[in-house]
Amino acid sequence: MHGHVTLISCSPEAAAIIASGGRISTMDGTADEIYAKSLAAGQEKNEKLIGKVLSSGHTSVLEHCYANLSFENVSVLAEQFLIEFRLASFTVKSRRYVDFSGAGYVAPDFSDPAQAAAFDAAVRALFGIYDELEAAGVPKEDARFVLPYCFCSNFFCSMNARELVHVMNELTYGRGSGIPELRALGESLFAQCEARLPFLALRKPEVYRRTPDWTPQAAQPLVPDAPVTVLSAAQDAGRKICDAYLLARGLAPQPLRKDEQTELLKTLLARPRRRELEQASYTLLFGGLSLAALTHLTRHRMQSLCPPQLLQNIRYDRYVLPQSVRDKGMEARYRRAGRTGRGAAARSRRGRVCPVLPDAQRPDGPCAHDDECGRALCLLPPALLHARAVGDPRRRLSGARRPARGLAGVV
């Protein structure tokens, strides 16, 4: 099965809106008058102006146009890649509540029929274990941990046109270009823009061309010794937040008694606008996140997340084991899923092909070549543990150390 992306809709009169943004800074008249002039100017003149404005580097005008996309039956690997774009909104079919036994999967193209057959057999085996877990009473949110990362995902995505141009180029020429499925999605979006919004079909292969990574010679693999480590924290965070609160009200910052600071923070937290909290920033190291947990963390947009690349850092021998699996007597079958994915990926690497991760696993060690990387990754289960994710979440630090519900441990 091969999925696709559809440009469902975009802002009405997109060219006129963007052109109006280009005109307003240099033209007399009100906003409404300038928009009326842009409508009267027609598509050709507006597109010509847009090209001129963009060539001058003023790409922010594209943000006045909004696009809505649907991704149908793409791999979860593609979903994970896409949700990392923070200037976009995503609504994804939940694996916690929906039965995915018949979801289907995206199979990479294999030149060797034997490898294709081995891949299909491994994926079907993982789906079979998922069915067994569900039949035994394991909740869907725990059974999903054995599904391979090639299983189909469906979701809606909305973003402004500037971000859309960025996403298309990353898929086609940048970080996604090494995976055929991602590159094909990028080409499809370019083709749809060329047909409907030609002024957005801005190909930038030189800008997005990937450069080799640089690594210090003495660099050693990171082995976190705690589920969450605070790498850096704001000094005197309470004072900074209180100072920002006072400044926002035209008052001079001043030392407050403990009871005054407490009262101020209570007042702030009772209000819907709490921007003062952003003065206190934290950098956290998450050690041993499952791929499923990483997906949830990624969806929090107000953070700077730096997860290791799956290809270079995945290991199939470390994964979370939900308590519900043990309670239902399905531990042996669950572990079988890990061995199935590990064996299939090893065979793929020997053939220089690299997607079948189950969702429970975590990336910690070397994986495979990047030339046809999507193949081994497709076998990853979401239970795999992603041992190195560095983030800068600005909220809910106090909840970061709470263990995931129902996890019996890491194996």
Question: Predicted regions span which residues?
Answer:
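A conserved ligand/cofactor-binding region detector
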Residues: 1-411
